Amino acid sequence: MTNYRHILFPIDFSPQINAAIPYVAAFARQLDAKVTLMSVVPPIWAGRGPIPEYAADLEISTRARLDRTLTAEVHGLSVERAVRSGEPGEQIVRFAQENAVDLVMMPTHGYGVFRSLLIGSVTAKVLHDAHCPVWTAAHAAEQHARHIPKTMICCVDGTPKSVELMRWAAAFSGYFGATLQLLHVTPPIADWAAFAGDRKLQEEEREMARARIEALRSRAGVEAPMKVAVGPIVAAVAECASEEGADLLIIGRGLLGATLGRLRTHAHGIIQHSPCPVVSV
């Protein structure tokens, strides 16, 4: 299990960072981790290419602004500040890889009329490419999760990759002294509630899923209560998190665009609709 000694918190100076920073500070204190506050200056384009001389000026002004940002919120922590130029998602991923970052923490940024359905492109890039776990909060300002999580739910999809995810979740919850629950969601059979035969088939599917997850849990050597829910995956995960008062969801990223298990293909939806922050492993 990794020792979480370096947290990266990318900053774009948006209001969302003010809602996320209490979590960052709490995690850093609990894990005794260094925090790097990082801002990325995106390329300025004119005509056929970028204008590097403007980027240099922007780096200087961004660095000055970064030095003034969140000073009170991170007081007493081990903090470094970094400014890079380039495409934000790429620069965040590269910095994390080159500087032994153990955890990236960042709010999501979806904009426009579809904000409730989207996560920002930068967050999506980091989720897809980062080598380390990524903590995200789609609605940190409205969420009421405890900054030090005491209740964690690990969403497992029933594939062999779930074994390592369970082990990771058990170890991570131990850092915080948090309780851990396992959750698996099986999709509903169409109109199953209307027909006795379909209800029986649905219960058989639920029990087969329970047996499959139980076998994986045994392989993982994890002692945690397990729930198998039936319903649309994103909605069922959000509902369970609300009912259990979860402070943190744990999901497996895998290859977010690949068909490696239903929960992985629904990762973005789970993040966007979760009532609490999500860490993607």
PLM regions: where:
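General small-molecule cofactor/ligand-binding pocket signal
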Residues: 36-38, 80-84, 135, 181-183, ...
